[in-house]
């Protein structure tokens, strides 16, 4: 289907991986305000900060992450921390602990989890959480109860003395939960762990207006001034929400998939990618949303699959979350049997875009007979993808596509 998203966040000697939220349109604005709006703003700010750090570290590579999954996993992890480690982790995620209690933070994530469970049945989405603990350790009941209450996480005993077998079992667990889309999660991580926390998601989105399958053609994609690659280029000719930004050097469109998802495709002018990325913020998204107009557009977007694995340790340290990776780490609310240390924070995500959508009676249609010349917008050079839940404006996925081939 047109939009397939799989994501994993792994934290070794604790780890995590999480998920997309889709809000029931019938959920009241009051409930959203009470449970989630403050959480969403912190999550979006953290998302853009993390995204900008990753882009700076890999200026010539594709980037694709699920920011809310990272926020979710780290917030869950904070339930097992104490003292400075805990305060640093929550503050690094963007939460003002003087204005919002820790209980309210976890209640906000709990509400998000409920929204996932109650999401539109037209979305194909599988998500969940699991904690794998070495059988020689005793998990504190308070931590077990907290992660069950707020994050619907389960605890599974594992023999980490046999790391090869344990890693295969965890890989198999995640693979089965994500319909085979996330495999070999622990591949290449050969340091035995005693605690592995996993949050997983498989998500398949379907365009409300599909691209024209018969119109997909191989075209040039200009990676940079010296590199040109061939890619299958999809076409949608229809009425689309479009903006040629007067403040930033870019054009953009907003598309929807069935359910509650909104996708922004942003095309910076040549050489202006960093300028646009530097300006990404909640205010920019609000301004773009207000400025979009319904326009007749011939939209060309590459049919693309992007995957990546990111070791987030250095990035999180730069963002102020440093205790997790030092001897100062305090995880005494998980177990008192051992001093847990984090060895890695690894995020894995995959994005697939193709043509298919849902045939809807009375829809605008894929092809229009136009009386005026349409806007022609070709995403044939590096571009940005942002996927939000359009009721809560939580940042689901962020991508920078440098080379789709």
From Swiss-Prot:
Residues with glycosylation annotation: 26, 31, 96, 260, 330, 369
Give yes or no: UniProt keyword Glycoprotein. Answer: yes
Keyword set for this entry? Glycoprotein, Lipid-binding, Secreted, Signal, Steroid-binding, Transport
Q: Which SUPFAM superfamilies match?
A: Serpins
The positions annotated as site (Conserved cysteine within steroid binding domain) read: 250
Which GO molecular function annotations are given, in alphabetical order? serine-type endopeptidase inhibitor activity; steroid binding
Main location, first listed in the record: secreted
Signal peptide range in chain numbering: 1-22
Give the UniProt entry's GO cellular component terms. extracellular space
> In which compartments does the protein localize?
Secreted
| Domain remark from Swiss-Prot or TrEMBL | Proteolytic cleavage leads to an important conformation change. This reduces the affinity for steroids.
- What's this protein's family per the entry? Belongs to the serpin family.
State what this protein does.
Answer: Major transport protein for glucocorticoids and progestins in the blood of almost all vertebrate species.
User: Per its record, how is this protein called by name?
Assistant: Corticosteroid-binding globulin
